[in-house]
Swiss-Prot record:
Family from the record: Belongs to the GHMP kinase family. IspE subfamily.
Active-site residue list: K21, D148
Official protein name in the record: 4-diphosphocytidyl-2-C-methyl-D-erythritol kinase
Keyword Transferase listed: yes
Cross-referenced PANTHER family: 4-DIPHOSPHOCYTIDYL-2-C-METHYL-D-ERYTHRITOL KINASE, CHLOROPLASTIC (PTHR43527:SF2)
Catalytic activity: 4-CDP-2-C-methyl-D-erythritol + ATP = 4-CDP-2-C-methyl-D-erythritol 2-phosphate + ADP + H(+)
Length: 319
């Protein structure tokens, strides 16, 4: 890795798109020695994204502004944390940035919006500050900041193991696949609560041996997600947190019921720890038609909805 002189850092505006993700498979295998859950997941980027803009500051300050006043822009925000971490690792303490966030991914939705914003910050400032950190180094920084962040950085279709930070790239899903995504804007779910509740309810069925973990990983590697539409059967969506969250969050129950009624959907599931849920479609046209038909029912229930195509790549600097 070669870090350029910060005096050569870019003076122009750098923009980065930070896409949301959905969980096509989320399996809680057991507990790790560090207290986190061991997971086996399939994660997929979708075309619903926040937009971040970065400019250098002459005084070395790092600041964040957002068009959503409900989002904290203080030091606990992953964008700010990522900026400080990258500056620390660069060795140039006088680097600064003014960051603007256009928030489009709903907050607390199980879509990794915060993680994606943090990952986008690593990419954006790596370019703005002319640091030349490699993709592998950025993924290492991302793993320090959050379990979902390495996936958000890499994007596309990935098997995710460990806490979610260990990635194995899948053959890209069919580019035409899409989802109808639905969320109650008045409801959010705490990820730590969801995993804590999962432990309370289902720890008796947790696996404990690494050999058992690896057996489940291998089964997922060999699953039909490698070719999701090669058969007429619906793709095998799974989310172990759904059976934790849905019984206690009525909005998730309502959302899943309305999504199940969509014509042409292949399968329905909750994403992450919720409360966002989605219906999977073979192509964007089918998803758009189904959403148009059901949108009045979603609106009547107070639900926000989107049609999102699958995204085949991760976070990149925009021209």
């Amino acid at each position: 890795m070669s870090i350029s002189n910060p005096s050569a850092a870019s003076e122009h505006l750098v923009s980065v798109s930070a896409p949301a993700k959905i969980n096509l498979h989320l399996e809680v295998l057991g507990l790790r020695s560090d207290g986190f859950h061991e997971l086996a997941m399939v994660m997929q980027s979708i075309e619903l994204a926040d937009q971040l803009h970065f400019r250098n500051t002459a005084d070395g300050s790092i600041s964040l502004r957002c068009d959503d006043s409900s989002l904290s822009t203080a030091g606990d925000n992953l964008i700010v944390r990522a900026a400080h971490l990258l500056r620390e690792r660069s060795g140039f303490s006088d680097l600064g940035a003014a960051i603007e966030l256009q928030k489009r991914i709903p907050i607390g939705a199980g879509l990794a919006g915060g993680s994606s914003d943090g990952a986008a910050t690593l990419v954006g400032l790596n370019g703005l500050w002319n640091l030349n950190f490699s993709q592998g180094q950025l993924e290492g920084f991302a793993a320090e900041l959050g379990s979902d962040m390495p996936f958000c950085l890499a994007g596309g279709s990935q098997l995710c193991f460990g806490r979610g930070e260990r990635l194995e790239s899948l053959q890209a899903m069919k580019a035409s696949m899409a989802v109808v995504l639905v969320k109650d804007p008045s409801v959010s779910v705490s990820t730590p609560w969801a995993y804590g509740r999962c432990k309370e309810l289902f720890s008796s069925r947790y696996l404990s041996k690494e050999s058992d973990f690896e057996q489940r990983r291998q089964q997922l590697r060999e699953s039909s997600w490698l070719n999701p539409l090669r058969a007429d059967d619906p793709p095998p969506l799974r989310n172990d947190l759904q059976e934790v969250v849905a019984p206690e969050v009525s909005a998730v129950q309502t959302t899943l019921k309305l999504l199940t009624d969509l014509p042409g959907s292949l399968a329905v599931s909750m994403s992450g720890s919720g409360p966002s849920c989605f219906a999977l479609f073979a192509d964007v046209a089918s998803a758009q038609a189904a959403l148009q038909l059901q949108q009045p029912a979603f609106a009547a229930a107070g639900l926000s909805s989107w049609c999102c195509a699958f995204r085949c790549e991760g976070i990149k600097l925009e021209a």
